[in-house]
Design a protein with these regions (language model features):
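N-terminal, post-signal-peptide region of Sec/Tat-exported proteins
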Residues: 47-78, 83
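Short hydrophobic/aromatic-rich beta-strand segments that constitute the beta-sheet cores
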Residues: 51, 78-82, 97-100, 150-152, ...
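Sec-dependent N-terminal signal peptides
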Residues: 4-13
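Flexible, surface-exposed loop/linker segments and immediately adjacent secondary-structure boundaries
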Residues: 108-147
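Gly/Pro-enriched, hydrophobic low-complexity segments
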Residues: 21, 132-211
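An acidic-aromatic
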Residues: 69-117
């Protein structure tokens, strides 16, 4: 079980934490941003996207690049399907997690695994636009002409043991997530970029089925 948790953390975590973000300035009207972000998120029922993940391990000089497909559907359903350079599948469906690595399959309940519960909540909050309401983080918001950057610094004990910071970049046109970045305590650095996004696309429930 511990090995599976570490594998998922490696797949969806990373970034280097910076006191400032080049090209960004603090949002002057945070209340307005919260309102617009929440309103746009309410209209987003589903997301279909490709993704590119780049992971920099502190012990290696070269980055590891992975590609795959991503689906999100309210409420609380996420599917990440890695197809290059390896095959890997992760499904988050409410309080259940399914992981398939080659021929190995694992089903985990977030109710019985606090670490997976935290990972699950982070992913869902990012997609549903509720990250600013998560009391487990201290939040700051920055912006440039085209995007807004939400910085999440963990204050809850469990999360502080996993991450230094998480940043979520959203497109100002529709407030959809364009990238998620995280910094592990180990210094490993990862960014997941979402491309070819389709909002409110037809996403079958069967994609999130955990048998």
């Amino acid at each position: 079980m511990h090995k599976i948790v570490l594998i998922v953390l490696m797949l969806i975590t990373g970034i280097s934490m910076k006191a400032q973000y080049p090209g960004y300035a603090p949002v002057t009207d945070l209340a307005r941003f919260r309102t617009e972000f929440a309103a746009a998120s309410q209209k987003t029922i589903s997301i279909k996207s490709d993704f590119v993940q780049e992971k920099n391990l502190s012990m290696l000089s070269e980055k590891i690049t992975s590609k795959g497909k991503f689906w999100f559907k309210k409420e609380s359903q996420v599917r990440m399907e890695y197809n290059h350079p390896f095959q890997y599948l992760m499904i988050l469906n409410k309080d259940k997690v399914f992981v398939k690595d080659g021929q190995k399959e694992n089903k985990i309940s977030t109710k019985s695994n606090k670490m997976f519960q935290q990972i699950n909540k982070i992913m869902i909050d990012c997609m549903q636009g509720t990250a600013l309401n998560n009391v487990d983080f201290k939040t700051k918001v920055f912006e440039n002409k085209n995007t807004s950057l939400v910085e999440l610094v963990p204050v809850a004990k469990g999360l502080k043991e996993l991450f230094k910071a998480i940043t979520v970049v959203v497109d100002k046109k529709d407030f959809s997530v364009t990238s998620i970045q995280m910094l592990e305590l180990s210094g490993d650095n990862t960014i997941i970029r979402f491309i070819n996004k389709e909002l409110n696309a037809n996403v079958p429930d069967a994609l999130f089925t955990i048998k």
